Curated annotation (Swiss-Prot):
Signal peptide: none annotated. Fourteen ClpP subunits assemble into 2 heptameric rings which stack back to back to give a disk-like structure with a central cavity, resembling the structure of eukaryotic proteasomes. It comes from Chlamydia abortus (strain DSM 27085 / S26/3). It is an enzyme of class 3 (hydrolase). This is ATP-dependent Clp protease proteolytic subunit 1. It is found in: Cytoplasm. GO terms for molecular function: ATP-dependent peptidase activity; ATPase binding; serine-type endopeptidase activity. Its main location: cytoplasm. Its EC number is 3.4.21.92.
Length: 192
């Protein structure tokens, strides 16, 4: 058996063990592909044993808002209670994903970091003034959606949230807990 085949078999065994434990790991940027992969795993667990808890482990620098909200919406539609655990980093859309669990089910490991900020448009912006105006209105709608998520999750005022996301705001796990982004610090998966 070639090294590549052995590596693929090992990866499959590991993936199966993780899914059998009802864990889904999201350890990459939020893209259409990574979101689709996560959604497939989440729904596999939902359909094979509905209503049983799932742990969604996040280590992501963020990425696509639309792809992230696709994962968010799917989790909200499931009957299985989902617990989020940040390990490492939940930045930008990764931080939003960490909030898709119900209150009391949002955790981070002790050395994790959370970063929140307002959405941005990447790359060079070109087009007619009317098109640019459309893009500006769309990003403001996206900002409002994200602010609303942080408002609901944290209980902070709109003014506090808008100030916090005006620029990149980095938090330790303890700071994120104090801010209301987390319900607790997780020292062992046995504590879930």
């Amino acid at each position: 058996m070639a090294d590549g085949e052995v590596e693929n078999k090992l990866r499959d065994v590991i993936e199966r063990k993780i899914l059998d434990a009802r864990r889904v790991f999201f350890s990459e940027p939020v893209t259409d592909k990574s979101a689709a992969d996560a959604i497939k795993k989440l729904w596999y667990l939902e359909l094979t044993n509905p209503g049983q808890p799932i742990v969604f482990v996040i280590n992501s620098p963020g990425g696509s808002v639309d792809a992230g909200f696709a994962v968010w919406d799917q989790i909200k539609m499931m009957t299985s209670p989902v617990t989020t655990v940040v390990t490492g980093l939940a930045a930008s859309m990764g931080s939003v994903l960490s909030l898709c669990a119900a209150p009391g089910r949002r955790f981070a490991t002790p050395h994790s970091r959370i970063m929140i900020h307002q959405p941005s448009i990447g790359g060079p912006i070109t087009g007619q003034a009317t098109d640019l105006d459309i893009h500006a209105r769309e990003i403001l709608k996206t900002k409002k959606r994200i602010v609303d998520v942080y408002l609901e999750a944290t209980g902070q005022s709109r003014e506090v949230i808008e100030k916090a996301i005006d620029r990149d705001t980095w938090m330790t796990a303890d700071e994120a807990k104090d801010f209301g982004l987390l319900d607790g610090i997780l020292f062992s998966f046995n504590d879930l």
